[in-house]
């Protein structure tokens, strides 16, 4: 070793280090993919290597299924499976990683088919929703029928889920699905509860002064007494119909009310709920 003034040159000489600039991700195309993955995304940027140094890429912390170097400014990633939005994209070349850029999202769920599309107001039956992007596994999928959450949701596949319908009433309720942090946005798929049906009236007659309490037996009367639930006796026009008084909701198959004053035999009786009318039943007479 050389020494000057008793100092060793090896210990006093500075060590000179050199490194290339880290890779930099600028943009990607496309910016989204189905949740089942396998799509191809082009990653554009800088410092990916003048030759193929076998770069690697990650989306949302998951390594791309494969990464193909194309140039110093472009590589290709085969997208892994995933869900959600706002995912980071990272490239590594020669042991150096780019800063994370949140550029990628998986497609939102898309409900496209529903069977059956209607059902009784008592609920607790299953409907199957067909579509896309429901997830590559059970990610705690959520389903709303209008503003009503399904009692239970069972993930079947990326293209099918099952919903246990809650008790309720109403029609044309948009079906919405959430997977991860993404909600479906389509307004085309709708569910409706079946309209009311009158099967029989007991007793089937009352004197013309009214005041008798009758039971109206049927189905799809809803889940509770609401202002839109009404029962009528008489013709279906504003002059002939008489609204039952003191209407009481017993359950989805029975109503009770006081008969209004009236005359005539074979009077039509019908129930209305959220604007939907039952077909008339002619089982009541004064």
Question: Which residues does each predicted region cover?
Answer:
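Extracellular recognition modules
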Residues: 1, 88-92, 174-178, 268-272
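Residue-level recognition of beta-strand termini and adjacent short loop/turns
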Residues: 71-73, 157-159, 251-253
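Beta-strand/beta-sandwich contexts
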Residues: 5-52, 96-139, 182-228, 276-286
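Short, surface-exposed alpha-helix to beta-strand junction/turn motifs within ectodomains of secreted
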Residues: 48-64, 134-150, 221-241
């Amino acid at each position: 070793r050389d020494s000057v003034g008793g100092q060793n040159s090896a210990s006093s000489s500075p060590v000179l280090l050199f490194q290339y600039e880290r890779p930099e991700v600028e943009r990607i195309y496309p910016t989204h993919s189905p949740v089942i993955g396998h799509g191809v995304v082009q990653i554009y940027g800088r410092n990916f290597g003048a030759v193929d140094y076998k770069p690697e890429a990650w989306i949302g912390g998951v390594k791309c299924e494969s990464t193909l170097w194309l140039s110093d400014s472009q590589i290709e990633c085969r997208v892994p499976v995933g869900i959600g939005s706002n995912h980071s994209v990272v490239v590594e070349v020669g042991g150096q990683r780019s800063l994370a850029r949140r550029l990628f999202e998986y497609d939102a769920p898309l409900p496209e088919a529903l069977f059956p599309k209607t059902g009784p107001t008592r609920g607790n039956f299953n409907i199957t929703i067909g579509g896309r992007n429901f997830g590559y596994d059970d990610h705690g999928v959520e389903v709303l029928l209008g503003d009503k959450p399904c009692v239970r949701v069972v993930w079947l596949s990326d293209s099918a889920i099952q919903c246990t319908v809650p008790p309720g009433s109403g029609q044309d309720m948009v079906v919405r699905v959430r997977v991860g942090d993404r909600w479906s946005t389509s307004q085309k798929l709708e569910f409706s509860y079946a309209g009311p049906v009158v099967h029989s009236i007991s007793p089937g007659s009352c004197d013309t002064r009214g005041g008798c309490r009758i039971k109206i037996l049927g189905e799809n009367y809803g889940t509770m007494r609401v202002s839109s639930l009404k029962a009528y006796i008489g013709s279906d026009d504003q002059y002939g119909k008489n609204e039952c008084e003191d209407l009481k909701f017993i359950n989805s198959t029975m109503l009770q009310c006081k008969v209004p004053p009236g005359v005539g035999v074979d009077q039509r009786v019908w129930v209305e709920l959220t604007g939907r009318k039952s077909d008339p039943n002619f089982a009541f007479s004064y």
